[in-house]
C-alpha cells in the first residue's frame, strides 16, 4: 500500500502548517500570547444567549435558507447604507459561517493559478494559506512599528506586478492593532485605480 501522505492533494502537502497548529513548538514556551485568533475573553451578552435559546426552543434548529436568513440579509443591507451611505442589493450579500470561510471563498472565486494578492505584514496567518490553496501567490508589503505601522506607498508600488489582481486590507490589524485612518485609505485609491486592483477587506474588528 502506498504511503498515506500520497493520498493527500499536493496543494495541501506543500502548504505550511499555520502557527496556531504548531502545538509542539508552542508547548516549549510558557509565556506565549496567542495573536492568531480573535477569541474574546468576555462572555457573550445575555440578550444574545437568551434569544438563541428561545429561538431553539421554538423549533429553529434545522437547516435555514441556503442563501441565509432573509431578515439577516436585510439587516446587512441596512447597515451598509447607514454606515457607508452605499446601497447594497440583497443579491450581493452571501453569508458564511465565519469571516475566515468567507475570505477563503473570495480567494477561490477571484484567483486563477499564478494570480497575486498583496497583503500588508504583519498579517493574520491564514491569509497566505488561503491565497496559496486557491492557486494564488501572496505578496507582502512590510509595515514597521518604528513607522507607526503606516503603509509606505513606494513599497506598495514596488510589490505590484502584472499578475497582481487584488489588494488585501485588514484594519484594525491583527496582530499589530494598527488603525488605518480615512486619509491613509485615500492615498491608496490612485494606486488601486491605476492598476485596476480588486480590494478585499477583512473588517472583523
Question: Where does each model-flagged region fall?
Answer:
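Residue-level signal for alpha-helix termini/capping positions
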Residues: 27, 57, 111, 160-161, ...
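Helix C-cap/helix->beta junction micro-motif
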Residues: 29, 134, 194-195
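N-terminal small-domain helix-loop-helix segment of the aminotransferase-like
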Residues: 2, 7-98, 105
Amino acid at each position: 500500500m502506498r504511503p498515506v501522505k500520497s493520498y493527500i492533494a499536493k496543494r495541501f502537502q506543500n502548504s505550511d502548517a499555520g502557527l496556531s497548529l504548531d502545538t509542539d513548538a508552542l508547548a516549549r514556551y510558557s509565556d506565549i500570547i496567542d495573536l492568531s485568533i480573535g477569541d474574546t475573553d468576555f462572555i457573550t451578552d445575555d440578550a444574545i444567549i437568551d434569544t438563541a435559546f428561545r429561538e431553539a426552543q421554538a423549533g429553529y434548529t434545522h437547516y435555514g435558507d441556503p442563501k441565509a436568513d432573509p431578515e439577516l440579509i436585510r439587516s446587512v443591507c441596512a447597515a451598509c447604507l447607514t454606515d457607508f451611505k452605499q446601497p447594497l442589493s440583497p443579491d450581493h450579500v452571501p453569508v458564511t459561517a465565519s469571516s475566515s470561510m468567507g475570505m477563503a471563498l473570495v480567494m477561490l472565486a477571484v484567483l486563477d493559478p499564478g494570480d497575486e494578492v498583496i497583503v500588508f505584514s504583519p498579517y493574520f496567518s491564514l491569509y497566505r494559506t488561503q491565497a496559496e490553496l486557491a492557486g494564488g501567490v501572496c505578496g507582502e508589503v512590510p509595515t514597521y512599528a518604528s513607522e507607526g505601522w503606516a503603509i509606505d506607498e513606494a513599497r506598495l508600488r514596488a510589490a505590484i506586478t502584472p499578475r497582481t489582481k487584488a489588494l488585501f486590507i485588514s484594519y484594525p490589524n491583527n496582530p499589530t492593532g494598527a488603525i488605518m485612518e480615512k486619509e491613509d485609505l485615500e492615498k491608496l485609491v490612485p494606486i488601486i485605480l491605476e492598476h485596476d486592483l480588486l480590494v478585499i477587506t477583512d473588517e472583523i474588528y
